[in-house]
Design a protein with these regions (language model features):
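Thiol-based oxidoreductase modules, predominantly thioredoxin-like and allied folds used
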Residues: 43, 66-85
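Non-catalytic, surface beta->alpha helical segment in thiol-disulfide oxidoreductase systems
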Residues: 94-137
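Short active-site neighborhood of thiol/selenol oxidoreductases, capturing the structured segment around
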Residues: 35-47
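N-terminal leader/targeting and pre-domain segments
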Residues: 1-36, 133, 137
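Short, catalytically relevant binding-site loops at active-site mouths
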Residues: 29, 47-48
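Short acidic (Asp/Glu) patches
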Residues: 83-97
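Typically the conserved alpha-helix immediately C-terminal to a functionally engaged Cys/Sec
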Residues: 51-64
Length: 137
């Protein structure tokens, strides 16, 4: 587990852009009671591809006219139980961080794995998400 003072700016980068942080299993489970909404879960990470591509890309995607009703995040390696619970809802995709999941009516409809983030620019990540928003939101 990384020191919170290291992770705090990585959390705030998302929360200052309107993301709701999910730090408990209860918060994750409550999110899935929103059966009539679309929502995104970003699995945050301290790795370089989270900082260079994933966080900037997912934040950029929030500017699209069509977008999920809720933007949420869990922090892998920090909020372990919440992250594990979120990953259970992301089956059949293997655990990966960072990763991004879009849900509609409680069902996963789009997923971006770490290997799709690594080496890509933030605009590529944002465009990938925007296409999914335009289709599902």
């Amino acid at each position: 587990m990384y020191p919170e003072e290291l992770c705090k700016p990585m959390r705030e980068e998302l929360t200052s852009s309107g993301f709701q942080e999910l730090t408990t299993v209860e918060q994750v489970n409550k999110l899935f009671t929103n059966k009539d909404k679309t929502f995104l879960i970003f699995i945050n990470s301290v790795c370089g591809c989270a900082a260079g591509s994933a966080r900037p890309g997912v934040i950029l995607s929030t500017q699209n006219a069509k977008r999920p009703d809720l933007f949420t995040t869990v922090f892998a390696g920090q909020d372990k139980e919440a992250t594990q619970k979120a990953r259970e809802y992301m089956t059949p995709y293997p655990p990966s961080s960072p990763s991004i999941a879009l849900f509609k009516n409680g069902e996963i409809v789009h997923f971006i794995e770490r290997h799709e983030i690594e080496g890509n620019l933030k605009h590529v990540i944002a465009d990938n998400l925007i296409k999914a928003y335009n289709q599902h939101c």
